[in-house]
């Protein structure tokens, strides 16, 4: 008996024009070879700026060259250099204490609070009063202002993680991001920030998980002024608190944190208040410069006019590297995250090289650095593109497609904000797949991968992922995906020993190849939907 997914894949191939014989087909053996190289222990986890990352970047560049993809990096090469600064936290240095009417109360690093390094100061210290500002969000579109009628100048703001539940999922992901909250705190003169875990955030991102990153550096790219592009000078003293420690901030006021949690759960307005406590924070950081590179390849379109419009396909090449302090397996290979995405780009490059007629619009393939450090390579490219920014009409981002099951659907985060939804649905249909809504909206994935840096430059963008359904009725796709996210995501076990389904991998490549054709050959360029929040917020 033939497998159902095999029959659907064959039906998908028959939809191609002009003929099946002339149309490239994804090769699972080629995909497997690329994945095997990129996720090998010899690359030591491909951390941004590392030897392993540089080797992987040269590998991608060599594959682009092999398949006739033109270089579009710096000075006629495939590499766009990204100047960086990295900082390590000196692990014996973080201290934090609360001061109130009962004197000084120290908190315990890693048990009660976590800090990251500074990229601006070797030594960072701050003592200031604490003020609670709800979620720390200002969103005029949703009639929400946590900074109304409260003075935070010269104070440390205390915020709940997350957002009001009434906010739409993807708009809410924008407002709940650390970048937005830091921007608001800086705007109103705060000198520090403390983020509090909530019962919801503890389920989706447990406080204890943060400990695992203590050996890893923070990074930012360096702008023309020689400064970290995204650092907020006034907020070098920030911390996150555990659920238990967070309770201690409300001992001097009439409202308990549990009552605030209850208000948040009921979607009611949160109080804003002086907490009648001060906090002292201190740390030391070791700071140094670093270089890494995006790998950029270009396929010129065939239409005399439309070739001046560019469709970007991106996938981050970096992962978490290795932790020398860890015994046993200490390499974060990042097989799913995101060697799969980059292997997809390379295999797409091969397929486009075999295409008899190039698509009408041009294509840009980018293997990005620094995603795990804060979407840095994408941010740098989007603000320093190697093609004119107005020429970029769309971005499709590939990040950690979970390929351990026989997926029968895809998710396109952000598709409902632009005309890309219909294009993606059509490509999925031709691939014998279903386009489904976000199955895990609580994760706020729309702002957590590289496509969002293109969104912030006004480019309609989506993040394409495998869905939570399977052609194999014996598989529980939802369970398989959840198990990967809970057990293997950002763990050393995300490696080649996973039960990777290479037929599914070929299907994912073919889906993206079809999507690239649909966008590049469409009569009209993608546009934001009328009145869309992201289109209106970031229009150029």
Language model region names:
Residues 109-229, 300, 330-333, 337, ...:
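Extracellular/luminal Protease-associated
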Residues 101-102, 112-145, 149, 228-334, ...:
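Soluble metallo-hydrolase cores and metallopeptidase-like ectodomains found primarily
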Residues 20-73, 245, 308-310, 529:
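N-terminal hydrophobic or amphipathic helices/low-complexity stretches enriched
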Residues 107-108, 221-257, 368-468, 472-474, ...:
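Metal-dependent peptidase/peptidase-like ectodomains
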Residues 23-24, 41-51, 120-121, 132, ...:
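Second-shell loop/turn segments in exported
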Residues 44-164, 292:
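Noncatalytic luminal/extracellular "stalk/propeptide" segments of secretory-pathway proteins
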Residues 350, 354, 468-538:
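His/Asp/Glu-rich mid-to-C-terminal helical/loop segments that flank catalytic regions of hydrolases
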């Amino acid at each position: 008996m033939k497998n159902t997914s095999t029959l659907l894949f064959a039906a998908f191939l028959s939809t191609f024009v002009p003929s099946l014989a002339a149309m490239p087909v994804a090769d699972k053996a080629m995909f497997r070879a690329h994945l095997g190289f990129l996720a090998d222990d010899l690359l030591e986890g491909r951390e941004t700026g590392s030897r392993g990352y540089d080797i992987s970047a040269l590998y991608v560049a060599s594959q682009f060259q092999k398949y006739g993809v033109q270089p579009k990096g710096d000075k006629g090469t495939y590499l766009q250099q990204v100047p960086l600064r990295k900082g390590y936290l000196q692990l014996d240095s973080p201290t934090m204490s609360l001061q109130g009417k009962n004197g000084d109360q120290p908190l315990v690093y890693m048990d009660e609070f976590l800090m990251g390094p500074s990229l601006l100061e070797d030594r960072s210290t701050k003592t200031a009063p604490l003020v609670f500002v709800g979620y720390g969000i200002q969103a005029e579109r949703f009639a929400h202002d946590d900074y109304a009628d409260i003075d935070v100048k010269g104070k440390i703001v205390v915020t709940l993680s997350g957002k009001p539940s009434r906010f739409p999922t993807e708009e809410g992901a924008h407002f709940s991001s650390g970048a937005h909250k830091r921007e608001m705190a800086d705007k109103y003169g705060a000198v520090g920030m403390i983020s509090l875990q909530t019962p919801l955030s503890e389920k989706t991102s447990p406080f204890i998980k943060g400990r695992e990153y203590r050996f890893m550096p923070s990074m930012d790219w360096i702008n023309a002024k020689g400064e970290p592009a995204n650092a907020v000078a006034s907020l070098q003293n920030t911390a996150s608190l555990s659920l238990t420690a967070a309770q201690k901030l409300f001992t001097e006021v009439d409202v308990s944190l549990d009552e605030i949690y209850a208000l948040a759960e009921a979607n009611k307005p949160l109080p804003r208040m002086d907490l009648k406590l001060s906090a002292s924070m201190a740390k030391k950081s070791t700071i140094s410069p670093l270089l890494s590179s995006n790998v950029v390849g270009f396929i010129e379109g065939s239409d005399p006019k439309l070739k001046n419009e560019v469709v970007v396909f991106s996938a981050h090449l970096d992962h978490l590297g290795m932790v020398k302090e860890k015994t046993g397996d200490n390499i974060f290979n990042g097989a799913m995250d995101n060697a799969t995405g980059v292997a997809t780009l390379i295999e797409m490059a091969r397929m486009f090289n075999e295409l008899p007629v190039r698509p009408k619009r041009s294509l840009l393939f980018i293997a990005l650095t620094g995603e795990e450090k804060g979407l840095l390579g994408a941010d740098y490219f989007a603000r320093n593109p190697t093609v004119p920014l107005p020429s970029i009409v769309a971005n499709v981002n590939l990040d950690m497609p979970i390929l351990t099951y026989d997926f029968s659907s895809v998710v396109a985060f952000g598709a409902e904000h632009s005309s890309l939804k219909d294009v993606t649905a059509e490509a999925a249909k031709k691939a014998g797949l279903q386009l489904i809504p976000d199955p895990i909206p609580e994760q706020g994935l729309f702002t957590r991968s590289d496509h969002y840096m293109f969104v912030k430059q006004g480019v309609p963008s989506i993040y394409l992922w495998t869905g939570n359904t399977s052609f194999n009725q014996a598989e529980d796709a939802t369970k398989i995906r959840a198990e990967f996210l809970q057990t293997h995501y950002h763990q050393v076990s995300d490696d080649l020993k996973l039960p990777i389904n290479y037929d599914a991998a070929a299907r994912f490549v073919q889906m993206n190849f079809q999507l690239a054709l649909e966008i590049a050959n469409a009569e009209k360029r993608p546009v934001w939907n009328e009145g869309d929040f992201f289109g209106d917020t970031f229009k150029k």
